[in-house]
Amino acid sequence: MDHRLLEIIACPVCNGKLYYSQDKQELICKLDSLAFPLRDGIPVLLETEARPLALEESHS
């Protein structure tokens, strides 16, 4: 994941900051407790493709 891209993209739901999870290959929005997948290194920033984070995931 290109860190320059991470600086300019935002959560499509709340426009909040996204955090990269390298081990899960996801972009995390802590405000909405959503995880957006990366497919072939490309962020899929669609709310319908996001998975809800478990409570323990959203606080880490």
From Swiss-Prot:
Recorded family membership: Belongs to the UPF0434 family.
Name of this chain's protein: UPF0434 protein KPN78578_09190
Species for this entry: Klebsiella pneumoniae subsp. pneumoniae (strain ATCC 700721 / MGH 78578)
Source taxonomy: Bacteria, Pseudomonadati, Pseudomonadota, Gammaproteobacteria, Enterobacterales
Any one of the GO CC terms: cytosol
Alphabetical list of Gene3D superfamilies matching this protein: 2.20.25.10
PANTHER family found in the cross-reference section: PROTEIN PREY, MITOCHONDRIAL (PTHR33505:SF4), ZGC:162634 (PTHR33505)
SUPFAM superfamilies recorded: Trm112p-like
Disulphide bonds in the chain: none
